């Protein structure tokens, strides 16, 4: 299923020097976002920086949202993870997409202009409405919390 999403190019290098975000394979869930920097940027250990992607999206459909997620190799190989763990893009947001990068590693890491640094995934949204109750119906789990089911 394909859903049209409005895309605004904020950096003229997108679509010329660097491709528009796209799915790499028919089974891809995310589209890569690129570091649209003016110069290469070295992120020191422990440092967090905000990186422009050069695009904005308007999802428009309230039954959808977008999330910015890490690329697996960045965190595993280089210690570069998202500073906010997941970026949530509400359907009515129209501003620039930025990626918060945190170097949790022990070595400086240099992002180069146009590097793929995160991925954009569109997800369904259910807006819940709370129903106030005094007690919950009994469930098998009940109030069992962290670690209650063990590890084996």
Curated annotation (Swiss-Prot):
Needed co-factor(s): Mg(2+)
EC number per UniProt: 3.6.1.23
InterPro entries from the UniProt entry: dUTPase, dUTPase-like, dUTPase-like_sf, dUTPase_trimeric
Alphabetical keyword list: Hydrolase, Magnesium, Metal-binding, Nucleotide metabolism
Disulfide pattern: none
Catalytic activity: dUTP + H2O = dUMP + diphosphate + H(+)
GO process terms (BP): dUMP biosynthetic process; dUTP catabolic process
Cross-referenced SUPFAM superfamilies: dUTPase-like
Enzyme class name: hydrolase
Pathway: Pyrimidine metabolism; dUMP biosynthesis; dUMP from dCTP (dUTP route): step 2/2
Single GO term (MF): magnesium ion binding
The keyword Transferase belongs to this UniProt entry's keyword annotation: no
Residues annotated for substrate binding in this entry: 71-73, 84, 88-90, 98
Family statement drawn from the similarity comment of this UniProt entry: Belongs to the dUTPase family.
Protein role: This enzyme is involved in nucleotide metabolism: it produces dUMP, the immediate precursor of thymidine nucleotides and it decreases the intracellular concentration of dUTP so that uracil cannot be incorporated into DNA.
Entry-linked NCBIfam families: dut (TIGR00576), PRK00601.1 (NF001862)
PANTHER family: DEOXYURIDINE 5'-TRIPHOSPHATE NUCLEOTIDOHYDROLASE (PTHR11241:SF0)
Name of protein: Deoxyuridine 5'-triphosphate nucleotidohydrolase
Lineage: Bacteria, Pseudomonadati, Pseudomonadota, Gammaproteobacteria, Alteromonadales
Gene that encodes the chain: dut
């Amino acid at each position: 299923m394909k859903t049209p999403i409005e895309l605004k190019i904020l950096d003229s290098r997108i679509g010329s020097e660097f491709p528009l975000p796209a799915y790499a394979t028919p089974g891809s869930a995310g589209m890569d976002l690129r570091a649209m920097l003016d110069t290469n940027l070295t992120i020191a250990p422990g440092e967090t920086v905000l990186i422009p992607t050069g695009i904005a999206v308007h999802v428009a459909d309230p039954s959808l949202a977008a999330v910015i997620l890490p690329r697996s190799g960045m965190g595993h190989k280089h210690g570069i993870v998202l500073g906010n763990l997941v970026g949530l893009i509400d359907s009515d947001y129209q501003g620039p997409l930025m990626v918060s990068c945190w170097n949790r590693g022990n070595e400086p890491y240099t992002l180069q202009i146009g590097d793929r640094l995160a991925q954009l995934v569109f997800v369904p949204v259910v807006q819940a409405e709370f129903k106030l109750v005094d007690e919950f119906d009994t469930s098998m789990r009940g109030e069992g919390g962290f670690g209650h089911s063990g590890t084996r």
